[in-house]
Structures are given as structure tokens and as C-alpha cells.
Amino acid sequence: MSKKGLKLGVALAAGAGAAAILTKTSQENKEIKATKAKKAEAARSDYRNTERGKYEKNSKGIYYTNGNYEAFARPEKPEGVDDKNAYIVGSGLASLAAACFLVRDGQMPGSHIHILEAMDIAGGACDGIFDPTRGYVMRGGREMENHFECLWDLFRSIPSIETPGVSVLDEYYWLNKHDPNYSLCRATVNRGEDAHTDGKFNLSQKGCMEIMKLFMTKDEDLYDKTIEDVFDDEVFNSTFWLYWRTMFAFENWHSALEMKLYFQRFIHHIAGLPDFSALKFTKYNQYDSLILPMQKYLEDAGVDFQFNTEVTNVIFDFKDGKKIASAIECKVNGVEKGIVLTENDLVFVTNGSCTEGTIYGDQNHAPNGDAEVRTSGCWSLWKNIAAQDPSFGHPEKFCSDINKTNWESATVTTLDDKIIPYITDICKRDPRTGKVVTGGIVSCQDSKWLLSWTINRQGQFKDQDKDKVCVWVYGLFTDVPGDYIKKPMKDCTGKEITAEWLYHLGVPEDQIDELAEHSAVCVPTMMPYITAFFMPRTKGDRPDVIPDGCVNFGFLGQFADTPRDTVFTTEYSVRTAMEAVYGLLGVDRGVPEVWGSVYDIRELLSSSVKLMDGKSPLEIDIPGAGIIKKPLLHFIKGTVIEKILRDYDVLKDGM
């Protein structure tokens, strides 16, 4: 056979073989499709519309709900609760909330609840004290809003310690009705001049598109990514970013995932971002307004507070797929002690801390010192627990780079009337009326420290002299020289921080040093881990509130993981507490879901227009969009869709 004939024969044979394979493949595909069709038909025939099982508990022993039916219901007493004890590590907001839920909804005897606190005072990060050697100290403040569902569920039941017969929520509600919060000057430039941000975000079309893209990105696509990975200068140079990073303390290197969650969580408040009209504040500092009423409620219930008790580890037994907390290791007044546990002993631990390692300065001393992770404390405790099982999280993701997690705040207290006029010129209100003053932070837009300051209702402390004003100041950039004080904020005394603040208030330079020395006292606080929870993360870095397999142990607070909610809020602390108690104790009541504005078409339409400073999304210049826009608008004409688009200013006159 010739070579040509041989090649032809081979080709024919190959073709026949390929045809046979294709025929076989085609037949197999038909069979697969037929099988799928049969399964789909079987599924349809088995389908039944019902709401039975709609609120079945998940693997954590909880379910989420919304609406008044569940919100107003009182759960039955869980079975066997009288035979159980609870050990709560820490006495911050999350821990106290857990104890309150154990008392109110779990109906556990107060004497069975033991709060183990390393310090000699409750409150954790929710502080507010007068230090005779330094002055008034507030490391931070608490911005709240009407859709903190778990927080308000709790505080409706906590009696006021000022007004007999009403709750903390009642007081708070009335206060913010009578004295609503809003700012009259959001930012300044050129030493005290109004920056005239004028309620605008000043985002370009590209910047808006970057935000919208982030908004729609899946969580898993944002694991370990930074904000710099998803935004560029189109966002970073906008007024939106000035508002955002100063209000929430986000830095460019922080988590893109948390940024997205924040945007989704508070989408209903986009319009209130420029003037803080979305926010509500307590009457006093958070210690007096939130912590003390909770502590009294618990003490009245017989809860056992054990101060000067530092928990260093929780030991686990692992058997038959169960993770059982079997012992607590602690130091009581420096003496080592152990607490043996059974499955009937519930343990709740606040893992990590944003205020651990705080270094305090004073009027004449900078807050210098060792800001590294210590051999004790919340971070060490979490590391000891995490070493026992991967499901207990990865603390090192959050506490290993203090250059990226620190900032510094300071409490400035005026001593006379000399600084007051400069404050009044900016915020347009007298700070001594007892009403809203700045209405949120005033950001010094051109400050090298990116300094912001706020004055809440005075007095912030119950025993505060009515002629004194407490100002909270913070700087995002602590390692660069200032504009008046030519050294980094972290190296500055209280007096020097006051001087830098006065410079940005517009005080004449020849008066600054005198006023900083004699007309105010300042207490600076450096917090190495204050934004640790904003560090980029992936799934599993934060442990679940109740890790899989745990039968008597749960995590609380800002470093425990719960779906959809956002850290650095009072709501997050209370939500994790509610979930942990309900899940471990078997409380048969729904946990209020995170407010669902992200799924509300009205909020989405409204926020889109607000973000674009009144421009409609339909005005965005997208190649090819005009071809389909006209037919679509014609299709919806006269329908409820057209009405809602017009109601929320997406469809404007002439469109």
C-alpha cells in the first residue's frame, strides 16, 4: 500500500473511532439529561408549599427572625437550667449582656452566674472615669442607631438607674426624640474654617462604580483583601472617604470584606452619613449610661462578680466529636487557681480586645511604653485556647502588627471659658447647654494627624463641673509630625495634643501654648489594638460564636464570628452574647436578624441616588446602555415599578 493510501486508511479509521466516541458521548449526555429531568420531576411532585420548620434551629442551636411576634414573646424556661452554672470571662459589654440574657431569657438563678474579671471595675472598652491624678478619661465613644436590634431588645429590660419605673431604652428614646442629633459642621480646613462639605460625597462615576462593585462582591472573593485592593484614588480622594474613614476609623490597609459588610449593614443610613443625623447618643459616657445599669440589674439578680480574677486558659476535652470545656485556669489576686467544669457548666469567653495594652499619658507625659502583646490578657488567653483546636480561630491575624492596628485618642477638659468661643464658632452651638453640641466628630481635613474631635452632651460625667467641657479627640495617623507640634502624636504629651487641636480650631498661634498650659487638661491614651478587628481576614480566622462540636463553650465580642453584622459596634457585642446564650442554654426564641435594609429595594434605590449626590443611576454613562434603556422604560410605564423609581428619584422628570 502506498504511503498516501496508508494515511487515508489511518484517517478513515480515526474518523470512524471518533464518530463512535462522539455517538457514545452523545448518548451518555442524553441519558444524563433524562436522569436529571426525572429527578427534577420527582422533586416537583414531592414539593409542598408550607412554612412548617421555617424557624428550625441551626447547628448552633439558634434561629433568626424578625417582627414583633418574636420580639415581644417571652421564652419558656429551658429544661435543666437550675442544674447549670455559667462562667463568663470578662465584664465588658458582651459579657454583661450574656449574663443579662441568662437571667432574663434563660431564667438561670443569678447565684449560678459567675463573672470573672481581671480588673477591679466592670465595663471593658466601655469606660468613662475620673482619675484624680490625670483627669477625666474616655478612650472612645459609642455611636448607635435605631436598628441595633439585639441591643435594644436587651435594654428595653434594663431598668434606668436615674428614673424610677422606666428602662434604659425609654430614657434613650425620649432623649433622642427631644434632642435629635445632627452636625452643623462636619469638617474644617485652614485652621477652623468650614470645609463646606455641604452634605456631598463628591464621588466620580468611576468611584461610584467601584463602591457598587464592592457592594455586590461575594464574601469569599474578599478574603484577606485590603481596601486598597478594591478602591483607587477615585474613592480615596473623595469626600465620601473623608466621612467614612474618620467616622469608622478605617485605614486603606484594612479589610475590604469588613468595608463591604459595613456598607451593606448601614445602607439605610447613607443619607445621614454627611451630617450624622442617622446617629443617636447616650446622655452620659458609655460607662455611666450602659454599663452601670447592667451591673446593677445583675447584682440585684444575685449574679456573682469576681474582680481581680484573670483567666489565663480554658482546657478542653475532645471525645466523640464533642469539644467540652473541662477546666478554667486563672489567677485570683495573683494566686493561681483552677475551676473544674462539667458539661452542665457553661463557659463564655470574650476573645481578643481592642483596648488591651492601652497606655495612658497625662498633661505632661506622652503615652509611651511597651505596646507589644503581653504574656497575659485577652490576646494571650485566646492564643492558649486557639492552640487546642483550629475551630477556635487565629488570633495572630489580628494582633501581630500594631503599626496597622493602633491609633490614639485624648480627653481634653476645659478649665475656663477661653477656649469655648472657638468651639462655638465651629459647631454653631454653646457646648454648656446640656444638649447636642458637635453632633458627631468634626474632622480637620488638612491635619497631618487626620485629627477629629467631638463634644457630646455635657456633662459627660454625672459629677462633672457644669462649667467644664469634656472633648474627645483622636488621630488616625499617630506616627507623622503634626502641623503645629512638629512631632508624631504618639510622642506628644497631653499639653502638646491640646496645642495641636487648638491650632486646628483657629486659635491665634501666640495664644496656643498659654491656653494649652492653663485653660485645659488632657489625658492621651494610646491603644495598640483599637482597629485589630479591621485587619484582613479569611474564613475561620474569627471563631464561630459557638464553634462546631462545642457543648458548653462559646465566644463573645468583636472577634467572634456571626453572619452579616459589623464589628466596632455595641450591637455586635450584644448580638454575639445573645447567640451564645440562646444556643448553649437552649433558649427557644428567635435572635433578631441583622436589619435587612440591604434586601430592601427602597433603601437600595434611595442610597444609590444619595451616593451620587442626587444623580440617578440611570444617568451613568455605560457603553451600550442607551440601547436598552428606552425599551425598558417603555415596558415599565404605568406600572408599580415606574412609581417606585419615581418615588425614590431614580426616574426623574423628562425620563
Predicted features, each with a name:
Residues 90-93:
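Glycine-rich Rossmann-fold phosphate-binding loop(s) that bind the pyrophosphate
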Residues 264-346, 351-352, 364-365, 370-379:
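Helical element adjacent to the flavin cofactor pocket in flavoenzyme catalytic cores
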Residues 98-111, 297, 301-303:
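A short, Lys/Arg-enriched amphipathic alpha-helix followed by its capping loop at the start of a domain
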Residues 161-268, 280-281:
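Rossmann-like flavin
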Residues 103-130:
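Glycine-rich FAD pyrophosphate-binding loop
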Residues 134-174:
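Conserved FAD-binding subdomain of flavin-dependent enzymes
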